[in-house]
């Protein structure tokens, strides 16, 4: 990749850093984790939570959401200008769960946003510590990616539900910065751009005037982010066309959908980071571990090691399976919603099963759910091996297509052969071949047609024993690759036949 030199590593994005060496990056990421941990400890004290209650993932989510809401400047400004009945724009809160007389009780807490901001800054040496906020946003995004398949959002914009593997980060807020942009999938960027273009079609003033100029800058920036995710010259050239369009309209939407489809084979590079809930960092800091001093990385062994020794609990509804709830959270912690189930199973050391076979709903509990029957259990978040998180999307070399797996965007840098039914995808490319992008389209289609599934199309490293911190002895697992190991589609394989 020619532009590799100008790219910053995730950790730099994560910490808004200038060029830093590995040790400095590890320290600044560690500092960010320390801040989240200290904040969480302080919030547990404020809320008078017991150790067990502080390790409850539902309480963690509420506390994380409170601080994100306290720092959401745009929304805060909007709320103050458009007061709605019964909502105090200066306050934030949510459900906190406590154990009372052997039962779980829900208690709604309310805090001044100013107070939450003070506690957060105090935990972060007086800084706003945006990197820590983004980190929590990415954890929420990874949890959403694991819990929900964005079928409706895809269909509404004219994309195919099978493209769900391109939708990483689709629930990340716009304000999530460079670190957020790095983890967004190709489909997520395409969706954002299509929504923008549609607004422009329906509202003549969208691109006009002073506001329109800002809109245009945002549009071009999003185009450049998406372009940076593509790894072939033709895909990038098409993105230039979309970006330079005088008046973006249906032709651009068509081009974007074409590009999204092409990304099923010519995979984009999308970052994966292991972002853990605050209730993991808090107890670690409380036990005296100094993340900044020890150094920490979101893409190496560190999150695995941290999860090996963490106790996290979750509320469980009467008919939910605690092991399934654990799998859901394990996948979210490892950013593995779009990874091949066989790779995940090997790393985890227990079978990871498709979403449709999980007897569990989301982690959050709705306000109208009955607490009387609510139980709780320990989440099993440990792993048998660890592996490096990848950013490559699984292509061997940038200029030649290699068979990317249809419903998978690799998370772990682990070598695997790919099963791959090209005809299914190629069928999506019949139709419009004329227009200004025809030569690029033709080139992209040619690259896809020449993609040979028998190549080992994901040249990764392998997995490592948890004792192998330096990643010295890769173990390359052999997988039975006769079928797709897709999380969202694994339970209805006949979808591939029709």
UniProtKB/Swiss-Prot annotation:
A motif (Bipartite nuclear localization signal) lies at residues 198-216. Its main location: virion. It is found in: Virion; Host nucleus. GO terms for biological process: symbiont entry into host cell; viral penetration into host nucleus. InterPro entries: Flu_NP. The keyword Ribosomal protein does not apply. Late in virus-infected cells, may be cleaved from a 56-kDa protein to a 53-kDa protein by a cellular caspase. This cleavage might be a marker for the onset of apoptosis in infected cells or have a specific function in virus host interaction. Residues 8-21 have a biased composition (Basic and acidic residues). Keywords: Capsid protein, Helical capsid protein, Host nucleus, Host-virus interaction, Ribonucleoprotein, RNA-binding, Viral nucleoprotein, Viral penetration into host nucleus, Virion, Virus entry into host cell. It comes from Influenza A virus (strain A/USSR/90/1977 H1N1). HAMAP family: INFV_NCAP. The lineage of its organism: Viruses, Riboviria, Orthornavirae, Negarnaviricota, Polyploviricotina. Belongs to the influenza viruses nucleoprotein family. It comes from the Viruses. Encapsidates the negative strand viral RNA, protecting it from nucleases. The encapsidated genomic RNA is termed the ribonucleoprotein (RNP) and serves as template for transcription and replication. The RNP needs to be localized in the host nucleus to start an infectious cycle, but is too large to diffuse through the nuclear pore complex. NP comprises at least 2 nuclear localization signals that are responsible for the active RNP import into the nucleus through cellular importin alpha/beta pathway. This is Nucleoprotein.
């Amino acid at each position: 990749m020619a532009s590799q030199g100008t790219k910053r590593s995730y950790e730099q994005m994560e910490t808004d850093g200038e060029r830093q060496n590995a040790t400095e990056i590890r320290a600044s990421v560690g500092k960010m984790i320390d801040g989240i941990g200290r904040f969480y400890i302080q919030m547990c004290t404020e809320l008078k939570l017991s150790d067990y209650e502080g390790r409850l993932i539902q309480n963690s989510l509420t506390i994380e959401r409170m601080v994100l809401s306290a720092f959401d400047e745009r929304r805060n400004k909007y709320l103050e200008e458009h007061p709605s009945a019964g909502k105090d724009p200066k306050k934030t809160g949510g459900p906190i769960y406590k154990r009372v007389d052997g039962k779980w009780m829900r208690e709604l807490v309310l805090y001044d946003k100013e107070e939450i901001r003070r506690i957060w800054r105090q935990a972060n040496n007086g800084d706003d510590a945006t990197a820590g906020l983004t980190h929590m946003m990415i954890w929420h995004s990874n949890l959403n990616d694991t819990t929900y398949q964005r079928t409706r959002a895809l269909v509404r914009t004219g994309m195919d539900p099978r493209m769900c593997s391109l939708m990483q980060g689709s629930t990340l807020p716009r304000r999530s910065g460079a670190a957020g942009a790095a983890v967004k999938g190709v489909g997520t960027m395409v969706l954002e751009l299509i929504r923008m273009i549609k607004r422009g079609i329906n509202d003549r003033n969208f691109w006009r005037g002073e506001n329109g100029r800002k809109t245009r800058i945002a549009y071009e920036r999003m185009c450049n982010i998406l372009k940076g995710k593509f790894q072939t010259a033709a895909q990038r050239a098409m993105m230039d066309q979309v970006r330079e369009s005088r008046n973006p309209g249906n032709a651009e939407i068509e081009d974007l959908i074409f590009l999204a489809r092409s990304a099923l084979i010519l995979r984009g590079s999308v970052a994966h980071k292991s972002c853990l809930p605050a209730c993991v960092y808090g107890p670690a800091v409380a036990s005296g571990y100094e993340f900044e001093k020890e150094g920490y990385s979101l893409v190496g062994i560190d999150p695995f090691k941290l999860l090996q020794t963490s106790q996290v609990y979750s509320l469980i509804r009467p008919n939910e399976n605690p092991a399934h709830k654990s799998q859901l959270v394990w996948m979210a912690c490892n950013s593995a919603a779009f990874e091949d189930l066989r790779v995940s199973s090997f790393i985890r050391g227990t079978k990871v099963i498709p979403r449709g076979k999980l007897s569990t709903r989301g982690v959050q509990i709705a306000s109208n759910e009955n607490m009387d029957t609510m139980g709780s259990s320990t989440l099993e978040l440990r792993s048998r091996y660890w592996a490096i998180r990848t950013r490559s999307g699984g292509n061997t070399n940038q200029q030649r297509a290699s068979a990317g797996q249809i419903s998978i965007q690799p998370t772990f840098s682990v070598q695997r052969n790919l099963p791959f039914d090209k005809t299914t995808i190629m069928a999506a490319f019949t139709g419009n071949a004329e227009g200004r992008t025809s030569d690029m389209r033709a080139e992209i289609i040619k690259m896809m047609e020449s993609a040979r599934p028998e190549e080992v199309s994901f040249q990764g490293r392998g997995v490592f024993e948890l004792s192998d911190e330096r990643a010295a002895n890769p173990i390359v697992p052999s997988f039975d690759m006769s079928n797709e190991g897709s999380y969202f589609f694994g339970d209805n394989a006949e979808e591939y036949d029709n």
